[in-house]
Amino acid sequence: MKKYIIHSLVILMTLLAFSTACSKFEEMGKNPYALYDAPSESFVHPIMFKTQYSLINVFRSSTALLMQYGVSTNSEVSSRVIDNYNIPEATTDDIWSTLYLQWGNAVQMHQKAIEENNPAMQAVALIIKSFLITHITDTYGDVPFKEAGQLVLRDDNDVYSTHYDTQKDIYRDVICMLENANEMLAVTERLKFSAVSDKVYNGEFDKWRRFGNSLYARVLMRIAMKVIEEDGGVLELDDKWEAVSVAQKLGELYNNYQNGSGDYPQMRSMEDRPMVPFSELNETEHTPFFTMTSGNWNTLAVSDVLVARMLDTDEKVDSDGITYHQYKPSKYNVLSPGSGRVEDPRYDSWWRKANGLPVHLLNDARVRFLDSDEHKSQAGNSRVGRMVRGKNPSTGIEETSAIWGKIYDLQNASAYPLMQYSELAFIYAEAGARGWISSISGFGGYMNLLKDGITQSILEWNPYVKVDDPMVVEYLNYCVNGALYSGQTFNSDNALEAILTHKWLAQFFIGIESWCDYRRTGYPLLKTNGPAAGNDQILPTRMRYPSDELYRNPQAYPEALDRWLGGTNNNKSDVWWAATAESYQTRLKGRQ
């Protein structure tokens, strides 16, 4: 068998090298994620596993810090801390070096399905390609795409340079790919392919179709503000597909979402989520955190911003003059009638203690905060929460959470979602609040979707609660009736802030999604001008291209820099869909 290995770039995936034949089943067993000259369906699980392996790692190492879910406790100089907007080269490369590899494999998978005359597997490949290339372009902006895909399929290695497509053109093609995928899966007579090849959906084409159309809703929302501002809301596509009105198409998808079927069926419940499995028993299926020591795992602390949003707290000022929020236990913590205070039922699923670390502290101030007796228990233990981890691998002791003392595991979970079902409710709530979908443009319409999104997110994260549990019901009422949105209760004027703040919470551990929403809308409102904030107090708008691109792509790379980055590979230029007046003005509030 020929084993396909897609090499590092012009992009890592642009060349395809063929290794010698492999005849030993033992060798295949040692590396089940190498891609062989096998049926197209054999590509599915290796690509999905490696993609999610990368994205959960990116969330913990980058997104969690940029989006103020967490704060680094490393005692290095503050100028090198990611949450202070100083991005090291290795972090800049993360998405590029991993997802381009898998995108190249998806290109190969698609070609295989064409050669097999297998439209259903072509559709699955198109969905995977769309998922991957949107993550790549959302991270960097303009990137190699069309020519790069052609190079993947070439047998020679004479050409290394490839054009950088504009993000707008990439999104045109993504919409066409998702339309084509939906069309092919709508007419396929096959119900399944091999479950062995697909550990996400067990080979069920219907669920792949629902995932593809759910991704379509995300894609439309991603570009809608820009297309409306730039093109009056209509995006031209290719010769096959007519121009798409983003608001009208979102309305069409919403009707299908509401009905659970139709021409664009989408996820119906959390059971339809794309859950990628991991295993502690198989070394080829370990999470990226499997061998992480307690010391390294605990370098990520919960941010004070997140604590103040999710829990009932008192604002305090410590002896060093640092403002922070101190948790006030609710009646659910002591399991008896009490103050009636409420707390987010998801908090326990993420953090082991209930106080947070303020963002953007200078290194000395951060060290003093963590070392201060004011922020420790009587036993001398820090009150600042770290991520839940299930079992401590060094001691074998199961570690419990902050509020209920339950056991959750983020370090070595059995599966992680690529996309949450709850995201759809937030997408359509936003579309309703913006007046893009008339049937839900009234306050009650998008409020119900907001409440449904919050409820579904709680159920996605906390297996110990049910919809009608008092803790869930009272928290939901608090989200609507509490003065949580710029000091006001939920109303039509602050609806976008409310919807997108709760969407931010719901996107915990989902790759780069909350970072994309922030750049697109400016929500949640995040303070970006703290004492240690770098990058001119601008939360990074993109990741820089890898430093070796000038060497690997000497013609196209400088052209891309000059075309849209002003000649400088920077973290401050907006990608195409984020460059709107509304987004800029909302993000500016964080520096005021």
Task: Describe the predicted segments one by one.
Residues 1-30:
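Bacterial Sec-dependent N-terminal signal peptides
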Residues 190-195, 515, 526-527:
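Long amphipathic alpha-helical coiled-coil segments
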